[in-house]
Amino acid sequence: MVEDILAPGLRVVFCGINPGLSSAGTGFPFAHPANRFWKVIYQAGFTDRQLKPQEAQHLLDYRCGVTKLVDRPTVQANEVSKQELHAGGRKLIEKIEDYQPQALAILGKRAYEQGFSQRGAQWGKQTLTIGSTQIWVLPNPSGLSRVSLEKLVEAYRELDQALVVRGR
């Protein structure tokens, strides 16, 4: 089981779709060697060094957290049903209401659209909020994603810079 890494006062909570088998096996988020999450958040400015999956708890030192929409591990995220994503979206709203980070970054358009019953999502900041928490949709850093490392870093950096401008 991959546990959430959450606390009050976070700048951002990154929300993956569900754990892959590597993460489920190790208990660490974004654990597959091909997953680019740790490299991306470092290069985008969220951390001052590239953390390893087993150092995930150190995200809190940078006022970052991690959660997921669905607990069930799968080989590929497309194995998660619309119903699971929708139910996960309701649970996620409760978590975010409890912790109220500055931003919630949903990693993937499908996750956002199906988890929050939205259509036609664009990358970046959304108009929908959860209380005072901004919602952002960012490309998924999975190794299965065709988005280049450069584009991932650019998208994540936009969020990091927006939070700096917001004074957080």
Curated annotation (Swiss-Prot):
| Name of the gene encoding the protein in the UniProt record | mug
Which terms does the UniProt entry file under GO BP?
Answer: base-excision repair, AP site formation
Molecular function GO terms recorded: DNA binding; pyrimidine-specific mismatch base pair DNA N-glycosylase activity; uracil DNA N-glycosylase activity
Protein's name in the database: G/U mismatch-specific DNA glycosylase
Report the GO terms under cellular component: cytoplasm
Cite the NCBIfam families for this sequence: PRK10201.1 (NF007570)
One Pfam family, please name it.
UDG
Q: How does it assemble?
A: Binds DNA as a monomer.
Keywords (alphabetical) are: Cytoplasm, DNA damage, DNA excision, DNA repair, DNA-binding, Hydrolase
> So what does this thing catalyse?
Specifically hydrolyzes mismatched double-stranded DNA and polynucleotides, releasing free uracil
Q: Which PANTHER family match?
A: G/T AND G/U MISMATCH-SPECIFIC DNA GLYCOSYLASE, G_T MISMATCH-SPECIFIC THYMINE DNA GLYCOSYLASE
Q: So what does this one do?
A: Excises ethenocytosine and uracil, which can arise by alkylation or deamination of cytosine, respectively, from the corresponding mispairs with guanine in ds-DNA. It is capable of hydrolyzing the carbon-nitrogen bond between the sugar-phosphate backbone of the DNA and the mispaired base. The complementary strand guanine functions in substrate recognition. Required for DNA damage lesion repair in stationary-phase cells.
Highest taxon listed in the record's lineage: Bacteria
Q: Does the keyword Cytoplasm apply?
A: yes
Q: What does the UniProt entry say about where the protein is found?
A: Cytoplasm
Q: Per the similarity annotation, which family is this?
A: Belongs to the uracil-DNA glycosylase (UDG) superfamily. TDG/mug family.
EC identifiers of the protein = 3.2.2.28
